[in-house]
Structure formats: C-alpha cells, structure tokens
Design a protein with these regions (language model features):
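A short, N-terminal "cap"/entry segment at the start of jelly-roll beta-barrel domains
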Residues: 1-62, 145
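Ligand-binding loop in jelly-roll beta-barrel domains
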Residues: 1-10, 116-142
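A generic fold-level signal
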Residues: 45, 58-62, 82, 106, ...
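Conserved short histidine dyad/triad with adjacent acidic residue
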Residues: 47-54, 66-82, 103, 116
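A generic structural signal for short beta-strands and their flanking turns/coil linkers
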Residues: 61-66, 86, 93, 128
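Conserved hydrophobic/aromatic positions in well-ordered beta-strands
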Residues: 66-68, 88, 133
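A short beta-strand-loop-beta hairpin characteristic of the jelly-roll/cupin
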Residues: 75, 81-108, 118
Length: 145
C-alpha cells in the first residue's frame, strides 16, 4: 500500500469475456504504463505514440486497452474508421477530435464512445501532451441478431 497523500485514479473496465472454442482464456494481469514501451505511429514525426498493454497478436484477448499520446502538434492526419465500437477516456490535455462530420473540443475527464465505422481524426494543439485510454473489442466477430 502507498503511504502517499497524493490522490490517485483507477480505471476498472468490466465486460463479459467472449469465449472461442479452441482458444484458451488469457490469464488475468495488472500492469502499469511504465512497464510498456511507447510505439511511434508511422509517419508521425515523433508526435503520436501508443502503449499497448497486451500483444496485439495474442488472439486470446477479446479487448485491448491502450494509452495513446500526442505531443503538441500531433495529428491523426486522415479520417480513419474501425470495424469495432471503441471508447476513449481523456487522461490529460486538450485536443479537437473529428467525429463523423463534426470537430469536437475534448479535454481531460471527457469520455467518447465511437460507433463502428465512425470517421475520426485528431489534432492536439498543445501546449502539453494529449493522452487518452483507448478501449476496443478485438479478435471476435460481431454477433448477428
């Protein structure tokens, strides 16, 4: 236990695990971001990084939680989409996020839920880093109703 008088934050994400026949469940783990390396995103001029808490190729996991960081001036320079819905919780800083047809100002403490195939982009104007938790379902087919 900590003897510090500083306030801390804890994010607990709960979901029902989606089993797949023939794939064993991953073991539970707790990890601090200091244990993960920053992976620079391609063609970002060292302004856009992602910390991955699990190996992206490990299909036992049915969700990922990453930390995305933009340095001032960092951008997602194109409207991208994803096949899965995903959540974003802003940890630090301010930016404008392109969601579908709108640019929305976001800052620390904000939460975004993005639908599948929602066009998105980001511009982090500064003055400091812009960081967020990125949650997304992975490695499972979307069920048809």
């Amino acid at each position: 236990w900590s003897n510090s008088s500083e306030i801390t934050n804890f994010h607990w994400i709960r979901k029902v695990y989606k089993d797949v026949k023939g794939i064993e469940r991953p073991t539970a783990f707790v990890k601090n971001e200091t244990e993960c390396e920053d992976v620079e995103m391609p063609n970002s001029n060292s302004t856009w990084f992602t910390k991955r808490f699990v190996d992206a190729d490990d299909v036992r996991h049915d969700m990922h939680v990453n930390i995305v960081t933009f340095q001032p001036g960092g951008v997602i320079p194109f409207a991208e989409t994803h096949v899965m819905e995903h959540g974003i919780f802003i940890l630090e800083g301010k930016a404008v996020y392109h969601l579908n047809q709108d640019w929305v100002e976001v800052e620390a403490g904000d939460f975004l839920w993005l639908r599948a195939f929602c066009p998105q982009a980001c511009y982090a104007g500064g003055p400091g880093p812009f960081r967020y938790l990125l949650y997304k379902d992975v490695n499972r087919h979307v069920p048809f109703l």
